[in-house]
A protein has these predicted regions:
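C-terminal substrate/ligand-recognition segments
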Residues: 256-375
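Extended, compositionally biased alpha-helical segments that mediate assembly or anchoring
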Residues: 462-527
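Conserved, well-structured interaction surfaces
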Residues: 1-53, 74-88, 92-110, 251-257, ...
Protein backbone atom coordinates (compact mmCIF):
# COMPACT_ATOMS: atom_id res chain seq x y z
CA UNK A 1 0.00 0.00 0.00
CA UNK A 2 1.05 3.60 -0.58
CA UNK A 3 1.87 4.93 2.88
CA UNK A 4 0.93 8.42 1.75
CA UNK A 5 -2.36 7.37 0.16
CA UNK A 6 -5.29 9.48 1.28
CA UNK A 7 -7.59 6.54 2.00
CA UNK A 8 -4.92 4.74 4.00
CA UNK A 9 -4.51 7.86 6.11
CA UNK A 10 -8.29 8.15 6.53
CA UNK A 11 -8.22 4.58 7.83
CA UNK A 12 -5.45 5.45 10.26
CA UNK A 13 -7.48 8.36 11.60
CA UNK A 14 -10.53 6.13 11.96
CA UNK A 15 -8.59 3.40 13.75
CA UNK A 16 -7.36 6.00 16.21
CA UNK A 17 -10.79 7.47 16.86
CA UNK A 18 -12.33 3.99 17.17
CA UNK A 19 -9.88 2.95 19.87
CA UNK A 20 -8.53 5.97 21.74
CA UNK A 21 -11.15 5.81 24.50
CA UNK A 22 -10.24 2.18 25.24
CA UNK A 23 -6.84 3.15 26.63
CA UNK A 24 -5.67 4.50 29.97
CA UNK A 25 -4.82 8.05 28.97
CA UNK A 26 -6.46 10.86 30.90
CA UNK A 27 -9.45 12.63 29.40
CA UNK A 28 -7.36 15.75 28.84
CA UNK A 29 -4.70 13.78 26.97
CA UNK A 30 -7.30 11.95 24.90
CA UNK A 31 -9.07 15.16 23.94
CA UNK A 32 -5.90 16.85 22.74
CA UNK A 33 -5.09 13.83 20.59
CA UNK A 34 -8.64 13.53 19.29
CA UNK A 35 -8.68 17.18 18.32
CA UNK A 36 -5.60 16.74 16.18
CA UNK A 37 -6.89 13.58 14.49
CA UNK A 38 -10.29 15.15 13.76
CA UNK A 39 -8.40 18.01 12.12
CA UNK A 40 -6.27 15.76 9.92
CA UNK A 41 -9.19 13.59 8.87
CA UNK A 42 -10.97 16.80 7.90
CA UNK A 43 -7.88 17.92 6.00
CA UNK A 44 -7.84 14.68 4.00
CA UNK A 45 -11.52 15.03 3.15
CA UNK A 46 -11.09 18.73 2.38
CA UNK A 47 -8.59 17.85 -0.35
CA UNK A 48 -10.86 15.10 -1.68
CA UNK A 49 -14.03 17.20 -1.72
CA UNK A 50 -12.45 20.27 -3.32
CA UNK A 51 -11.00 18.00 -6.01
CA UNK A 52 -13.84 15.56 -6.70
CA UNK A 53 -16.96 16.93 -5.03
CA UNK A 54 -18.85 14.13 -3.31
CA UNK A 55 -16.86 11.10 -2.12
CA UNK A 56 -17.63 8.11 0.15
CA UNK A 57 -17.87 9.15 3.80
CA UNK A 58 -16.16 6.57 6.00
CA UNK A 59 -16.28 7.40 9.70
CA UNK A 60 -15.03 4.11 11.12
CA UNK A 61 -12.23 1.74 10.10
CA UNK A 62 -13.50 -0.95 7.76
CA UNK A 63 -12.88 -4.63 8.46
CA UNK A 64 -12.32 -6.60 5.24
CA UNK A 65 -12.60 -9.99 6.93
CA UNK A 66 -15.86 -11.12 8.52
CA UNK A 67 -16.45 -14.38 10.37
CA UNK A 68 -14.74 -17.13 8.39
CA UNK A 69 -12.35 -14.72 6.71
CA UNK A 70 -14.26 -14.05 3.50
CA UNK A 71 -14.58 -10.45 2.37
CA UNK A 72 -18.04 -9.03 2.98
CA UNK A 73 -18.35 -6.62 0.07
CA UNK A 74 -21.50 -4.97 1.40
CA UNK A 75 -19.49 -3.45 4.25
CA UNK A 76 -16.76 -2.18 1.95
CA UNK A 77 -18.61 -0.76 -1.04
CA UNK A 78 -19.63 2.60 0.40
CA UNK A 79 -21.60 4.75 -2.00
CA UNK A 80 -20.44 8.19 -2.95
CA UNK A 81 -22.09 10.84 -0.80
CA UNK A 82 -23.32 14.16 -2.14
CA UNK A 83 -21.07 17.20 -2.06
CA UNK A 84 -23.47 18.81 0.43
CA UNK A 85 -23.16 15.87 2.82
CA UNK A 86 -19.38 15.79 2.46
CA UNK A 87 -19.05 19.50 3.24
CA UNK A 88 -21.27 19.02 6.30
CA UNK A 89 -19.12 16.07 7.43
CA UNK A 90 -15.85 17.98 7.07
CA UNK A 91 -17.30 20.95 8.95
CA UNK A 92 -18.42 18.62 11.75
CA UNK A 93 -14.91 17.21 12.07
CA UNK A 94 -13.45 20.72 12.16
CA UNK A 95 -15.99 21.82 14.76
CA UNK A 96 -15.01 18.80 16.86
CA UNK A 97 -11.35 19.67 16.41
CA UNK A 98 -11.92 23.31 17.38
CA UNK A 99 -13.80 22.28 20.52
CA UNK A 100 -10.92 20.07 21.68
CA UNK A 101 -7.82 21.97 20.60
CA UNK A 102 -6.19 24.87 22.47
CA UNK A 103 -5.94 28.36 21.05
CA UNK A 104 -2.23 28.28 21.90
CA UNK A 105 -0.36 25.16 22.95
CA UNK A 106 1.45 25.09 26.28
CA UNK A 107 5.24 24.80 26.10
CA UNK A 108 5.79 26.23 22.60
CA UNK A 109 9.36 24.88 22.50
CA UNK A 110 7.87 21.40 22.23
CA UNK A 111 4.44 21.96 20.71
CA UNK A 112 4.83 24.88 18.29
CA UNK A 113 3.52 23.89 14.87
CA UNK A 114 0.74 21.63 16.13
CA UNK A 115 -2.72 22.42 14.82
CA UNK A 116 -4.78 24.76 16.97
CA UNK A 117 -8.39 25.80 17.43
CA UNK A 118 -7.76 28.73 15.10
CA UNK A 119 -6.28 26.48 12.40
CA UNK A 120 -9.38 24.27 12.49
CA UNK A 121 -11.65 27.30 12.20
CA UNK A 122 -9.55 28.75 9.36
CA UNK A 123 -9.70 25.51 7.37
CA UNK A 124 -13.48 25.43 7.84
CA UNK A 125 -13.63 28.99 6.53
CA UNK A 126 -11.54 28.07 3.50
CA UNK A 127 -13.76 25.07 2.72
CA UNK A 128 -16.98 27.08 2.99
CA UNK A 129 -15.49 29.80 0.77
CA UNK A 130 -14.71 27.11 -1.81
CA UNK A 131 -18.28 25.80 -1.47
CA UNK A 132 -19.73 29.30 -1.97
CA UNK A 133 -17.66 29.92 -5.11
CA UNK A 134 -19.07 29.41 -8.63
CA UNK A 135 -17.55 25.92 -9.07
CA UNK A 136 -20.02 24.56 -6.49
CA UNK A 137 -22.48 27.46 -6.38
CA UNK A 138 -23.65 28.14 -9.94
CA UNK A 139 -26.88 29.74 -8.71
CA UNK A 140 -24.95 32.11 -6.41
CA UNK A 141 -26.86 31.04 -3.30
CA UNK A 142 -26.32 33.90 -0.85
CA UNK A 143 -26.78 31.58 2.12
CA UNK A 144 -23.48 29.92 1.24
CA UNK A 145 -21.70 33.26 1.19
CA UNK A 146 -23.25 34.10 4.56
CA UNK A 147 -21.97 30.81 6.00
CA UNK A 148 -18.51 31.39 4.51
CA UNK A 149 -18.35 34.88 5.99
CA UNK A 150 -19.48 33.73 9.43
CA UNK A 151 -16.86 30.96 9.49
CA UNK A 152 -13.98 33.08 8.22
CA UNK A 153 -14.76 36.05 10.47
CA UNK A 154 -14.97 33.70 13.46
CA UNK A 155 -11.57 32.25 12.52
CA UNK A 156 -10.09 35.74 12.22
CA UNK A 157 -11.49 36.77 15.61
CA UNK A 158 -10.22 33.59 17.29
CA UNK A 159 -6.73 33.87 15.81
CA UNK A 160 -6.26 37.56 16.61
CA UNK A 161 -7.94 37.54 20.04
CA UNK A 162 -6.89 34.19 21.51
CA UNK A 163 -4.44 32.60 19.09
CA UNK A 164 -1.61 35.16 19.24
CA UNK A 165 -1.67 35.50 15.44
CA UNK A 166 -1.30 38.70 13.42
CA UNK A 167 -0.21 40.18 10.12
CA UNK A 168 3.56 40.39 10.38
CA UNK A 169 5.67 43.27 9.16
CA UNK A 170 6.15 46.96 9.72
CA UNK A 171 4.88 49.39 7.13
CA UNK A 172 8.35 50.24 5.85
CA UNK A 173 9.04 50.49 2.13
CA UNK A 174 9.92 47.52 -0.01
CA UNK A 175 8.42 44.98 2.42
CA UNK A 176 11.59 43.88 4.20
CA UNK A 177 9.75 42.31 7.14
CA UNK A 178 7.24 40.72 4.77
CA UNK A 179 10.14 38.88 3.09
CA UNK A 180 11.62 37.65 6.37
CA UNK A 181 8.25 36.38 7.58
CA UNK A 182 8.37 33.44 5.17
CA UNK A 183 11.57 32.02 6.65
CA UNK A 184 10.80 32.60 10.33
CA UNK A 185 9.66 29.28 11.85
CA UNK A 186 8.07 31.16 14.77
CA UNK A 187 6.24 33.75 12.67
CA UNK A 188 2.97 35.00 14.13
CA UNK A 189 1.60 35.05 10.59
CA UNK A 190 1.50 31.23 10.53
CA UNK A 191 -1.85 29.52 11.06
CA UNK A 192 -1.13 26.07 9.59
CA UNK A 193 2.58 25.47 9.15
CA UNK A 194 4.97 22.71 8.08
CA UNK A 195 8.25 22.84 9.98
CA UNK A 196 11.58 21.69 8.52
CA UNK A 197 15.08 21.35 9.95
CA UNK A 198 18.58 22.08 8.66
CA UNK A 199 20.06 18.76 9.76
CA UNK A 200 22.28 16.98 7.23
CA UNK A 201 22.19 13.50 8.79
CA UNK A 202 20.06 11.28 6.53
CA UNK A 203 18.44 9.67 9.56
CA UNK A 204 17.08 12.92 10.97
CA UNK A 205 17.01 15.51 8.20
CA UNK A 206 13.76 17.02 6.99
CA UNK A 207 14.89 19.84 4.71
CA UNK A 208 12.91 22.31 2.63
CA UNK A 209 13.95 21.97 -1.03
CA UNK A 210 12.61 25.39 -2.09
CA UNK A 211 15.82 27.31 -1.30
CA UNK A 212 17.99 24.98 -3.36
CA UNK A 213 15.56 25.07 -6.29
CA UNK A 214 15.21 28.85 -6.26
CA UNK A 215 18.89 29.81 -6.13
CA UNK A 216 20.83 30.33 -9.41
CA UNK A 217 23.47 27.98 -10.73
CA UNK A 218 26.39 30.39 -10.45
CA UNK A 219 26.20 30.02 -6.67
CA UNK A 220 25.51 26.28 -6.98
CA UNK A 221 21.78 26.47 -6.49
CA UNK A 222 19.37 24.32 -8.44
CA UNK A 223 19.12 26.77 -11.33
CA UNK A 224 16.42 29.14 -10.21
CA UNK A 225 12.65 29.22 -10.70
CA UNK A 226 11.86 31.23 -13.81
CA UNK A 227 9.30 34.00 -13.42
CA UNK A 228 6.95 34.46 -16.35
CA UNK A 229 6.44 37.70 -18.23
CA UNK A 230 2.75 37.45 -17.37
CA UNK A 231 3.43 37.58 -13.61
CA UNK A 232 6.11 40.27 -13.81
CA UNK A 233 3.84 42.52 -15.87
CA UNK A 234 0.84 41.80 -13.63
CA UNK A 235 2.15 43.18 -10.32
CA UNK A 236 0.77 46.55 -9.22
CA UNK A 237 2.61 49.80 -9.60
CA UNK A 238 3.61 51.78 -6.52
CA UNK A 239 0.19 53.46 -6.44
CA UNK A 240 -1.54 50.07 -6.11
CA UNK A 241 -2.98 50.12 -9.63
CA UNK A 242 -2.41 47.57 -12.37
CA UNK A 243 0.25 48.77 -14.85
CA UNK A 244 -2.46 49.26 -17.49
CA UNK A 245 -4.51 51.44 -15.11
CA UNK A 246 -1.80 53.34 -13.23
CA UNK A 247 -0.94 57.02 -13.53
CA UNK A 248 2.69 55.89 -13.30
CA UNK A 249 4.33 55.02 -16.59
CA UNK A 250 5.21 51.35 -17.07
CA UNK A 251 8.27 50.54 -19.17
CA UNK A 252 8.43 46.80 -20.01
CA UNK A 253 12.23 47.00 -20.23
CA UNK A 254 12.62 48.75 -16.88
CA UNK A 255 9.92 46.62 -15.30
CA UNK A 256 11.39 47.15 -11.81
CA UNK A 257 10.56 50.87 -11.59
CA UNK A 258 7.84 52.17 -9.26
CA UNK A 259 6.36 48.79 -8.36
CA UNK A 260 4.41 47.45 -5.40
CA UNK A 261 6.80 46.89 -2.43
CA UNK A 262 6.24 43.13 -2.61
CA UNK A 263 7.61 43.07 -6.17
CA UNK A 264 11.17 43.47 -4.89
CA UNK A 265 10.75 40.52 -2.50
CA UNK A 266 8.98 38.31 -5.02
CA UNK A 267 11.39 38.56 -7.97
CA UNK A 268 15.16 38.68 -8.51
CA UNK A 269 16.49 40.22 -11.71
CA UNK A 270 19.63 41.58 -13.37
CA UNK A 271 21.42 44.02 -11.11
CA UNK A 272 19.51 43.30 -7.90
CA UNK A 273 21.16 42.23 -4.64
CA UNK A 274 19.94 38.79 -3.47
CA UNK A 275 21.97 37.97 -0.35
CA UNK A 276 22.68 34.70 1.39
CA UNK A 277 24.71 33.82 4.47
CA UNK A 278 28.20 33.85 2.98
CA UNK A 279 27.68 36.60 0.40
CA UNK A 280 25.55 39.50 1.56
CA UNK A 281 26.26 41.50 -1.61
CA UNK A 282 25.59 38.79 -4.21
CA UNK A 283 24.08 40.47 -7.28
CA UNK A 284 22.09 38.63 -9.94
CA UNK A 285 23.38 38.80 -13.51
CA UNK A 286 21.44 36.74 -15.98
CA UNK A 287 21.37 38.72 -19.22
CA UNK A 288 22.00 36.84 -22.43
CA UNK A 289 24.29 37.44 -25.34
CA UNK A 290 24.56 35.75 -28.71
CA UNK A 291 27.08 34.42 -31.16
CA UNK A 292 27.03 37.65 -33.13
CA UNK A 293 24.82 40.61 -33.98
CA UNK A 294 22.92 38.67 -36.63
CA UNK A 295 22.03 35.91 -34.17
CA UNK A 296 20.84 38.53 -31.69
CA UNK A 297 18.50 40.05 -34.27
CA UNK A 298 17.13 36.60 -35.12
CA UNK A 299 16.60 35.88 -31.44
CA UNK A 300 18.53 32.61 -31.45
CA UNK A 301 19.46 31.55 -27.89
CA UNK A 302 23.06 32.17 -26.99
CA UNK A 303 25.06 32.47 -23.80
CA UNK A 304 24.08 33.72 -20.40
CA UNK A 305 25.96 35.73 -17.82
CA UNK A 306 24.80 33.12 -15.34
CA UNK A 307 26.01 29.97 -17.13
CA UNK A 308 26.49 28.55 -20.61
CA UNK A 309 23.39 27.68 -22.61
CA UNK A 310 19.81 28.82 -23.05
CA UNK A 311 17.83 30.28 -20.16
CA UNK A 312 14.06 30.50 -20.06
CA UNK A 313 13.93 33.79 -18.18
CA UNK A 314 16.27 36.50 -16.91
CA UNK A 315 14.01 36.96 -13.88
CA UNK A 316 13.84 34.51 -10.98
CA UNK A 317 11.34 33.90 -8.20
CA UNK A 318 12.89 35.29 -5.02
CA UNK A 319 9.92 34.85 -2.70
CA UNK A 320 10.26 32.46 0.24
CA UNK A 321 14.06 32.45 0.02
CA UNK A 322 16.16 33.24 3.06
CA UNK A 323 18.53 36.26 3.04
CA UNK A 324 20.55 34.27 5.58
CA UNK A 325 20.41 30.95 3.73
CA UNK A 326 23.53 28.92 4.36
CA UNK A 327 25.67 28.19 1.32
CA UNK A 328 28.13 25.49 2.36
CA UNK A 329 30.44 25.89 -0.66
CA UNK A 330 30.48 27.60 -4.04
CA UNK A 331 32.40 24.64 -5.42
CA UNK A 332 29.80 21.88 -5.12
CA UNK A 333 26.13 21.44 -5.94
CA UNK A 334 23.28 21.18 -3.45
CA UNK A 335 24.76 23.79 -1.15
CA UNK A 336 21.41 25.34 -0.22
CA UNK A 337 19.67 22.01 0.32
CA UNK A 338 19.93 22.06 4.12
CA UNK A 339 17.25 24.72 4.46
CA UNK A 340 15.05 24.65 7.53
CA UNK A 341 12.67 27.38 6.36
CA UNK A 342 9.00 26.60 7.12
CA UNK A 343 6.09 26.47 4.73
CA UNK A 344 2.84 28.19 5.71
CA UNK A 345 -0.14 26.36 4.23
CA UNK A 346 -2.50 28.87 5.85
CA UNK A 347 -1.36 32.28 7.06
CA UNK A 348 -3.13 35.33 8.39
CA UNK A 349 -3.09 37.13 5.05
CA UNK A 350 -5.14 34.35 3.50
CA UNK A 351 -7.61 34.36 6.40
CA UNK A 352 -8.07 38.12 5.92
CA UNK A 353 -8.52 37.73 2.17
CA UNK A 354 -11.04 34.96 2.81
CA UNK A 355 -13.03 37.31 5.06
CA UNK A 356 -12.90 40.02 2.38
CA UNK A 357 -14.06 37.66 -0.38
CA UNK A 358 -16.89 36.16 1.67
CA UNK A 359 -18.04 39.63 2.76
CA UNK A 360 -18.11 40.75 -0.87
CA UNK A 361 -20.01 37.60 -1.84
CA UNK A 362 -22.71 38.34 0.73
CA UNK A 363 -22.97 41.96 -0.37
CA UNK A 364 -21.10 43.64 2.50
CA UNK A 365 -18.82 45.81 0.38
CA UNK A 366 -17.66 48.04 3.23
CA UNK A 367 -16.32 45.14 5.30
CA UNK A 368 -14.76 43.55 2.23
CA UNK A 369 -12.88 46.74 1.36
CA UNK A 370 -11.74 47.26 4.95
CA UNK A 371 -10.21 43.79 5.14
CA UNK A 372 -8.71 44.11 1.67
CA UNK A 373 -6.89 47.28 2.76
CA UNK A 374 -5.35 45.43 5.72
CA UNK A 375 -3.25 43.42 3.26
CA UNK A 376 -1.74 46.47 1.61
CA UNK A 377 -1.40 48.62 4.70
CA UNK A 378 1.05 46.20 6.26
CA UNK A 379 3.48 46.62 3.32
CA UNK A 380 3.39 50.40 3.38
CA UNK A 381 0.28 51.57 1.54
CA UNK A 382 -1.72 54.39 3.10
CA UNK A 383 -5.02 56.14 2.49
CA UNK A 384 -7.16 54.35 -0.06
CA UNK A 385 -4.34 51.82 -0.75
CA UNK A 386 -4.99 52.16 -4.47
CA UNK A 387 -8.67 51.22 -4.21
CA UNK A 388 -11.58 53.47 -5.09
CA UNK A 389 -13.93 54.12 -2.17
CA UNK A 390 -16.84 53.26 -4.48
CA UNK A 391 -15.45 49.82 -5.37
CA UNK A 392 -18.30 47.31 -5.01
CA UNK A 393 -19.87 44.13 -6.32
CA UNK A 394 -18.13 42.28 -9.14
CA UNK A 395 -15.46 44.97 -9.49
CA UNK A 396 -14.59 44.59 -5.81
CA UNK A 397 -14.54 40.80 -6.13
CA UNK A 398 -12.17 41.14 -9.08
CA UNK A 399 -9.89 43.35 -6.97
CA UNK A 400 -9.90 40.79 -4.15
CA UNK A 401 -8.94 37.95 -6.48
CA UNK A 402 -6.22 40.15 -8.00
CA UNK A 403 -4.85 40.83 -4.54
CA UNK A 404 -4.85 37.10 -3.81
CA UNK A 405 -2.82 36.54 -6.97
CA UNK A 406 -0.22 39.08 -5.81
CA UNK A 407 -0.08 38.46 -2.05
CA UNK A 408 -0.20 34.66 -2.33
CA UNK A 409 1.96 34.35 -5.46
CA UNK A 410 4.10 31.19 -5.55
CA UNK A 411 2.39 29.74 -2.48
CA UNK A 412 0.31 27.14 -4.33
CA UNK A 413 -3.05 28.91 -4.04
CA UNK A 414 -3.69 30.19 -7.56
CA UNK A 415 -4.72 26.86 -9.10
CA UNK A 416 -7.61 26.40 -6.68
CA UNK A 417 -8.63 30.04 -7.11
CA UNK A 418 -8.84 29.54 -10.88
CA UNK A 419 -10.83 26.33 -10.44
CA UNK A 420 -13.36 27.62 -7.96
CA UNK A 421 -13.98 30.80 -9.97
CA UNK A 422 -14.15 28.97 -13.34
CA UNK A 423 -11.48 31.16 -14.91
CA UNK A 424 -10.44 28.68 -17.61
CA UNK A 425 -12.87 30.18 -20.09
CA UNK A 426 -15.95 32.36 -19.92
CA UNK A 427 -18.52 29.58 -20.32
CA UNK A 428 -20.21 30.62 -17.09
CA UNK A 429 -19.58 34.35 -17.41
CA UNK A 430 -17.30 34.67 -14.39
CA UNK A 431 -14.43 36.17 -16.40
CA UNK A 432 -16.73 38.86 -17.80
CA UNK A 433 -18.15 39.53 -14.33
CA UNK A 434 -14.73 39.93 -12.77
CA UNK A 435 -13.15 41.79 -15.68
CA UNK A 436 -10.35 39.26 -16.21
CA UNK A 437 -8.99 37.47 -19.27
CA UNK A 438 -9.89 33.76 -19.53
CA UNK A 439 -7.00 31.36 -18.98
CA UNK A 440 -7.79 29.40 -22.14
CA UNK A 441 -6.48 30.24 -25.60
CA UNK A 442 -3.31 32.30 -25.74
CA UNK A 443 -3.39 32.77 -21.98
CA UNK A 444 -2.13 29.20 -21.54
CA UNK A 445 1.15 30.18 -23.20
CA UNK A 446 3.60 31.36 -20.61
CA UNK A 447 6.49 33.53 -21.74
CA UNK A 448 9.85 34.15 -20.21
CA UNK A 449 11.64 37.48 -20.20
CA UNK A 450 15.18 37.39 -21.53
CA UNK A 451 17.27 40.52 -21.21
CA UNK A 452 19.60 40.39 -24.20
CA UNK A 453 22.61 42.48 -25.15
CA UNK A 454 21.77 45.05 -27.83
CA UNK A 455 22.96 43.88 -31.29
CA UNK A 456 24.83 47.12 -31.98
CA UNK A 457 27.18 46.43 -29.06
CA UNK A 458 28.71 43.33 -30.64
CA UNK A 459 32.32 43.89 -31.70
CA UNK A 460 33.37 40.28 -32.26
CA UNK A 461 31.80 36.93 -33.07
CA UNK A 462 32.74 34.89 -30.04
CA UNK A 463 30.04 33.25 -27.99
CA UNK A 464 31.76 31.54 -25.08
CA UNK A 465 31.20 32.30 -21.43
CA UNK A 466 34.48 34.23 -21.33
CA UNK A 467 33.09 36.77 -23.79
CA UNK A 468 30.72 38.42 -21.31
CA UNK A 469 30.24 41.96 -22.60
CA UNK A 470 29.84 43.59 -19.20
CA UNK A 471 32.00 41.56 -16.82
CA UNK A 472 35.56 42.89 -16.40
CA UNK A 473 36.60 39.49 -15.03
CA UNK A 474 35.85 37.81 -18.37
CA UNK A 475 38.98 37.12 -20.41
CA UNK A 476 37.51 38.81 -23.49
CA UNK A 477 35.57 41.60 -21.81
CA UNK A 478 34.13 43.96 -24.44
CA UNK A 479 34.47 47.05 -22.29
CA UNK A 480 31.10 48.60 -23.11
CA UNK A 481 29.93 48.77 -19.48
CA UNK A 482 31.13 47.66 -16.04
CA UNK A 483 28.45 45.76 -14.16
CA UNK A 484 30.52 45.44 -10.98
CA UNK A 485 29.54 48.98 -9.99
CA UNK A 486 25.83 48.13 -10.02
CA UNK A 487 23.75 46.60 -7.24
CA UNK A 488 20.14 47.46 -6.47
CA UNK A 489 19.63 46.68 -2.78
CA UNK A 490 15.97 46.51 -1.63
CA UNK A 491 17.20 47.10 1.94
CA UNK A 492 18.90 50.40 1.03
CA UNK A 493 17.84 53.77 2.41
CA UNK A 494 15.40 55.76 0.30
CA UNK A 495 18.09 58.13 -0.98
CA UNK A 496 20.49 55.30 -1.85
CA UNK A 497 17.65 53.40 -3.48
CA UNK A 498 16.86 56.27 -5.83
CA UNK A 499 20.51 56.56 -6.83
CA UNK A 500 20.75 52.82 -7.40
CA UNK A 501 17.60 52.87 -9.54
CA UNK A 502 19.06 55.65 -11.69
CA UNK A 503 22.29 53.68 -12.19
CA UNK A 504 20.38 50.54 -13.11
CA UNK A 505 18.16 52.51 -15.50
CA UNK A 506 21.23 53.72 -17.33
CA UNK A 507 22.61 50.19 -17.66
CA UNK A 508 19.34 48.74 -18.97
CA UNK A 509 18.71 51.61 -21.41
CA UNK A 510 22.17 51.53 -22.95
CA UNK A 511 22.88 47.82 -23.02
CA UNK A 512 19.82 45.57 -22.98
CA UNK A 513 16.72 44.69 -24.96
CA UNK A 514 13.76 42.83 -23.54
CA UNK A 515 13.20 39.59 -25.47
CA UNK A 516 10.04 37.49 -25.18
CA UNK A 517 10.87 33.80 -24.87
CA UNK A 518 7.94 31.61 -25.94
CA UNK A 519 7.96 28.56 -23.68
CA UNK A 520 5.73 26.57 -26.02
CA UNK A 521 7.85 26.53 -29.15
CA UNK A 522 11.21 27.66 -27.78
CA UNK A 523 11.54 30.81 -29.89
CA UNK A 524 12.80 34.15 -28.68
CA UNK A 525 11.40 37.31 -30.20
CA UNK A 526 12.90 40.77 -29.53
CA UNK A 527 10.39 43.43 -28.46
Amino acid sequence: ANNNGVWLNVRRCNLFLDNIDKGTLSEEERNLLKGQVYFWRAWLYYRLVTTYGGVPIIKSAQNPTIGDGTIEESTLNVERSSTDDCVTFVCEDLDNAASLLPSVWADPSVNYGRVTKGAAMALKGRLLLFYASPLFNRSNDKARWDAAYTANKAAYDELTTNGDRELVGATSKRAQDWEKMFVNPLSKEAVLITLYNNISDDQFKFNNSWEQSARPKDIKGGGGIAATAEMVDLFPMADGKKPSESSLSYDPLKFYKDRDPRFYRTFAFNGVCWPYNTNKTYTVWNYQWFKDAAAAVEGKPGNSALYDGDVSSSIFVRKRTDPNAYNTSNLSSGVFSQSGSPYMEIRMAEVILNVAEAACGKGDNATALTFLKYIRERVGYTGDCGFSSTLAGDALMGAILYERQIELAYEGKRFDDMRRWLLWDDSFGTCTRLGVEPISGNQTRRHGIILAVKPELYTNSKAGKDCDPFNPEASEYLGTSDRTKISLDPDASDSDWENQIATLDNFYENNLNRVVNDQLDGTSTPT
